Amino acid sequence: MKVLLIKDVKGLGKAGEIKNAKDGYARNFLIPKGFAKLATDDVIKEWQEEQKRKEEELKKELAELNELKEKIESVTLHIKHKLGANGQLYGAITNKEVAEHLKEHGIEIDKKHIDMKQIKTVGEYTVDVKLGHGIHAKLKIVVEGE
């Protein structure tokens, strides 16, 4: 019996492949558990259309992420912070504070996506921002004392 695999099946194949499976295996395990569908022309056509739609959504999402990356990399955050007695910052700058400053520039990023150590001294820093799908942006931060 020919089946279209919906999920990867160990020993049979990967999702999207059309495979020959024994009738009992297909009827009693693969199809009821949602691992496969009977490979009719309509099912194959529907699967291909769904894959095209997913691919288009992914392209659109990647384009939006690349646009966001360019926007982040074009911004330099200037953060003014109180200084302690020894010239160090009074309190550290965290990813939460960086996310709040990005909001002021119209960029909303979850603080969990900003990969940085706490900044405790005045100076220039480059911070990695993870946007998803393997896309990373470099954010420049300039910390100044008050």
Swiss-Prot record:
Binds to the 23S rRNA. PANTHER family: 50S RIBOSOMAL PROTEIN L9 (PTHR21368). InterPro entries: Ribosomal_bL9 (IPR000244), Ribosomal_bL9/RNase_H1_N (IPR009027), Ribosomal_bL9_bac/chp (IPR020594), Ribosomal_bL9_C (IPR020069), Ribosomal_bL9_C_sf (IPR036791), Ribosomal_bL9_N (IPR020070), Ribosomal_bL9_N_sf (IPR036935). The keyword RNA-binding applies. GO terms for cellular component: ribonucleoprotein complex; ribosome. SUPFAM superfamilies: L9 N-domain-like, Ribosomal protein L9 C-domain. Keywords: Ribonucleoprotein, Ribosomal protein, RNA-binding, rRNA-binding. Pfam families: Ribosomal_L9_C (PF03948), Ribosomal_L9_N (PF01281). Belongs to the bacterial ribosomal protein bL9 family. It comes from the Bacteria. This is Large ribosomal subunit protein bL9. GO terms for biological process: translation. The keyword rRNA-binding applies. HAMAP family: Ribosomal_bL9 (MF_00503).
